[in-house]
Amino acid sequence: MAASALHQTTSFLGTAPRRDELVRRVGDSGGRITMRRTVKSAPQSIWYGPDRPKYLGPFSEQTPSYLTGEFPGDYGWDTAGLSADPETFARNRELEVIHSRWAMLGALGCVFPEILSKNGVKFGEAVWFKAGAQIFSEGGLDYLGNPNLVHAQSILAIWAVQVVLMGFVEGYRVGGGPLGEGLDKVYPGGAFDPLGLADDPDTFAELKVKELKNGRLAMFSMFGFFVQAIVTGKGPIENLFDHVADPVANNAWAYATNFVPGK
């Protein structure tokens, strides 16, 4: 969900920040790096406000008072009260968006190599949970199966590069830009929206909802991929092919009732 704290809501969420506050945080230089623009009214969308769709439709229970429909992806469900505290709520919104994005990338990375492999593209190992182990093989790990792209033989080197690169990106995000310009930590815009897809405020509001809906599905997908890997020892595409070939013998119920850990 949106990551800015509740007391920092923009007019996109109902309260317009004053220009002097933006100048104080960003500067009045007229440069390209600015905070995410604001608008004069709340999003005109069915996904926001008190009349937004709820998690059980007309059968939903009373919506908690702190779930007002102000933020994207709010279906009025918080049985455990995890978002009752405003600071926790803001933190959870940020975490959900970040995990959603990683899950969408991860889900694509799990299925795409298998799809390519099924269509004749050569890989050292196309199954996602087996691919990383290739670095321990004698020949090492070749990116896309091509030693001329990236050839790796040291797990420590990969770990170090990942820490540095991901640390840099996360530092950029948390710091609000390379120089601490105060960019939104979750929706910075600028170079992260080169096509200008979020220029229109109402379109931006819809895209936030779509991102979360797809991200939540991707997180469930990743969980399913983990379970499939443990239970079947196969990738998601191979499992799909097995299910289509014999739906009765290859389905979740059949595996659950015959699964023996360690075998």
Swiss-Prot record:
This is Chlorophyll a-b binding protein, chloroplastic. The modification Phosphothreonine is found at T38. The gene is RCABP89. One of its GO terms (cellular component) is photosystem II. It is a multi-pass membrane protein. Chlorophyll b 1 binds at Y55. Disulfide bonds: none annotated. Chlorophyll b 4 binds at Q162, R173. Photoregulated by reversible phosphorylation of its threonine residues. The lineage of its organism: Eukaryota, Viridiplantae, Streptophyta, Embryophyta, Tracheophyta. Chlorophyll b 2 binds at R101, V150, L179. The N-terminus of the protein extends into the stroma where it is involved with adhesion of granal membranes and post-translational modifications; both are believed to mediate the distribution of excitation energy between photosystems I and II. The chain crosses the membrane at residues 97-117, 149-169, 217-237. Residues 1-35 form a transit peptide. Chlorophyll a 5 binds at K210, Q228. Chlorophyll a 4 binds at N214. Binds at least 14 chlorophylls (8 Chl-a and 6 Chl-b) and carotenoids such as lutein and neoxanthin.
